[in-house]
């Protein structure tokens, strides 16, 4: 690669860092909004064009797909979602992920991350490995911030098996506004840590089931970035974190 190509690549990367691309799942919504805005503007209905212009911006912002710097290290478990840690509790794994060949039946630490409509809604793999299970469960649409959302709402379970044979579970949960869970992977796919695996449209929550013995390295109320924030480390003897909102 010559210097001119390097310069162009560097400029393109800089633009992507400052102006994230729109995920393919959101491009059709963006195009529809732009076309409607253009038609209304053409017919001089300017009083409607402004709100639709704002709508175009909101659609682009919601489906933004920023680049993330994924940390490297043995056993690291990263956040699969942008948002705020709303719950940390020891609970039995869901039936769809339980069993001897799954997450087992004993309680595991579940870290729940609430995604508002302002957060990036691309979900990423917390660990590298094989997608061993995917299970979609239709359900209700109660507030995703509530504990019962894990059992009542529309949801999709994933189980990723690492090369060491350790299983990590995660669940996409639809919220009050979100009515569409979109998978980007399938069973038997191999994913890297931080790789895009799905998205939920318009506000939702994501639960991560940490393997036995893994201590969460986030605190209630902490903000997380998908693919970057470390939730825990397999094999680590770290102490639980506590935090204070100031």
Curated annotation (Swiss-Prot):
Its cofactor is pyruvate. Is synthesized initially as an inactive proenzyme. Formation of the active enzyme involves a self-maturation process in which the active site pyruvoyl group is generated from an internal serine residue via an autocatalytic post-translational modification. Two non-identical subunits are generated from the proenzyme in this reaction, and the pyruvate is formed at the N-terminus of the alpha chain, which is derived from the carboxyl end of the proenzyme. The active site is at residue 204. GO terms for biological process: phosphatidylethanolamine biosynthetic process. It catalyses: a 1,2-diacyl-sn-glycero-3-phospho-L-serine + H(+) = a 1,2-diacyl-sn-glycero-3-phosphoethanolamine + CO2. One of its GO terms (molecular function) is phosphatidylserine decarboxylase activity. The record marks 203-204 as: Cleavage (non-hydrolytic). It comes from the Bacteria. Keywords: Cell membrane, Decarboxylase, Lipid biosynthesis, Lipid metabolism, Lyase, Membrane, Phospholipid biosynthesis, Phospholipid metabolism, Pyruvate, Zymogen. Binds 1 pyruvoyl group covalently per subunit. One of its GO terms (cellular component) is plasma membrane. Pathway: Phospholipid metabolism; phosphatidylethanolamine biosynthesis; phosphatidylethanolamine from CDP-diacylglycerol: step 2/2. It holds the Pfam family PS_Dcarbxylase. Its EC number is 4.1.1.65. InterPro entries: PS_Dcarbxylase, PSD-A. The modification Pyruvic acid (Ser) is found at residue 204. NCBIfam families: PRK05305.1-2, PRK05305.1-3, PRK05305.2-5. Belongs to the phosphatidylserine decarboxylase family. PSD-A subfamily. Heterodimer of a large membrane-associated beta subunit and a small pyruvoyl-containing alpha subunit. This is Phosphatidylserine decarboxylase proenzyme. It comes from Zymomonas mobilis subsp. mobilis (strain ATCC 31821 / ZM4 / CP4). The gene is psd.
């Amino acid at each position: 690669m010559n210097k001119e190509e390097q310069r162009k690549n560097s400029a393109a990367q800089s633009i992507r860092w400052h102006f994230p691309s729109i995920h393919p799942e959101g491009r059709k919504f963006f195009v529809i909004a732009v076309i409607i805005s253009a038609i209304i503007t053409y017919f001089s209905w300017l009083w409607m064009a402004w709100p639709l212009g704002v709508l175009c911006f909101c659609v682009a912002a919601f489906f933004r797909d920023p680049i993330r710097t994924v940390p490297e290290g043995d056993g690291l478990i990263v956040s699969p979602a942008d948002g705020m840690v709303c719950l940390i509790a020891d609970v039995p794994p869901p039936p769809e992920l339980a069993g001897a060949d799954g997450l087992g039946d004993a309680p595991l630490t579940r870290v729940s991350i609430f995604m508002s409509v302002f957060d990036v809604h691309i979900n990423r793999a917390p660990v590298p490995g094989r997608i061993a299970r995917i299970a979609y469960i239709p359900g209700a649409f109660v507030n995703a911030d509530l504990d019962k959302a894990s059992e009542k709402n529309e949801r999709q379970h994933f189980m990723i098996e690492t090369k060491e044979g350790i299983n990590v579970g995660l669940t996409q949960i639809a919220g009050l506004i979100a009515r569409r869970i979109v998978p980007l992977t399938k069973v038997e796919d191999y994913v890297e840590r931080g790789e895009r695996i799905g998205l939920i449209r318009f506000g939702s929550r994501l639960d991560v089931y940490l393997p036995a013995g893994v201590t969460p390295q986030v605190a209630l109320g902490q903000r997380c970035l998908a693919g970057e924030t470390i939730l825990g480390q397999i094999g680590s003897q770290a102490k639980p974190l506590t935090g204070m909102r100031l």
